[in-house]
């Protein structure tokens, strides 16, 4: 738990003053905060093999430290052999301490383990939120490579209270996300 406390303390002691100075906020309440991290795995192949959902739930729960839930389809699509309410993905939403703990492990341990890693893209969604696509779940040290039956990717979305992309980018950069270039393109 000391890592979590240190990341929160770093936010209060270093990141808030840096962003206040950079953007000229009059109050510390204007400084953007990281609200939640949503990890999602879309598993279209789960229509053919039902065990993939259970495997993905256990792996995502191991990675995040929180129970993952299956997401279900909203409607029938006959071309994909998909029925309404059939499980087709897995997701977990992290907030508070678990969010900071996961962010710390992602930045310090998991991202550097990606082969030929040169940084992540710096494109945000227009509202200060950022989604990172990961190709393989094996970059996380919690996953035992010997027990992997299928390589599964995931989307990691960082939801911030930032009003603009520049504010969101600055916040995530201060948290240590390794963007490809020093300034936003």
From Swiss-Prot:
Q: Which SUPFAM superfamilies match?
A: RL5-like
What InterPro entries does the database record attribute to this sequence?
Ribosomal_uL5, Ribosomal_uL5_bac-type, Ribosomal_uL5_C, Ribosomal_uL5_dom_sf, Ribosomal_uL5_N
Q: From the UniProt record, which GO molecular function terms apply? A: rRNA binding; structural constituent of ribosome; tRNA binding
**Keywords in alphabetical order:** Ribonucleoprotein, Ribosomal protein, RNA-binding, rRNA-binding, tRNA-binding
GO biological process entries: translation
Q: Which residues form the signal peptide?
A: none
The reply on keyword tRNA-binding is: yes
Could you tell me which Gene3D superfamilies the record lists for this protein? 3.30.1440.10
| Top-rank lineage group of the source organism | Bacteria
Q: Which GO terms describe its cellular component?
A: ribonucleoprotein complex; ribosome
Query: What family, per the record?
Result: Belongs to the universal ribosomal protein uL5 family.
Assembly: Part of the 50S ribosomal subunit; part of the 5S rRNA/L5/L18/L25 subcomplex. Contacts the 5S rRNA and the P site tRNA. Forms a bridge to the 30S subunit in the 70S ribosome.
Its annotated function is as follows: This is one of the proteins that bind and probably mediate the attachment of the 5S RNA into the large ribosomal subunit, where it forms part of the central protuberance. In the 70S ribosome it contacts protein S13 of the 30S subunit (bridge B1b), connecting the 2 subunits; this bridge is implicated in subunit movement. Contacts the P site tRNA; the 5S rRNA and some of its associated proteins might help stabilize positioning of ribosome-bound tRNAs.
**Protein name as annotated:** Large ribosomal subunit protein uL5
């Amino acid at each position: 738990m000391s890592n979590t406390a240190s990341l929160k303390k770093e936010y209060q002691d270093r990141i808030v003053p840096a962003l206040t100075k950079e953007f000229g906020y009059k109050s510390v309440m204007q400084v953007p905060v990281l609200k939640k991290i949503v990890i999602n795995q879309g598993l279209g192949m789960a229509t053919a093999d039902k065990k993939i959902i259970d495997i993905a739930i256990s792996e995502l729960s191991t990675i995040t430290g929180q129970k993952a839930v299956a997401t279900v389809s909203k409607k029938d699509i006959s071309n994909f052999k998909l029925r309404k309410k059939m499980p087709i993905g897995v997701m977990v939403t992290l907030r508070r301490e678990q969010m900071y703990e996961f962010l710390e492990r992602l930045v310090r341990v998991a991202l550097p383990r990606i082969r030929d890693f040169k940084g992540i893209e710096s494109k945000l969604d227009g509202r200060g939120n950022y989604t990172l696509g990961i190709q393989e779940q094996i970059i996380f040290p919690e996953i035992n490579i010997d027990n992997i039956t299928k390589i599964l990717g995931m989307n990691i979305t960082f939801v911030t209270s930032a009003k603009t992309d520049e504010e969101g980018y600055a916040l995530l950069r201060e948290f240590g996300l390794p963007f490809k270039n020093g300034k936003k393109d």
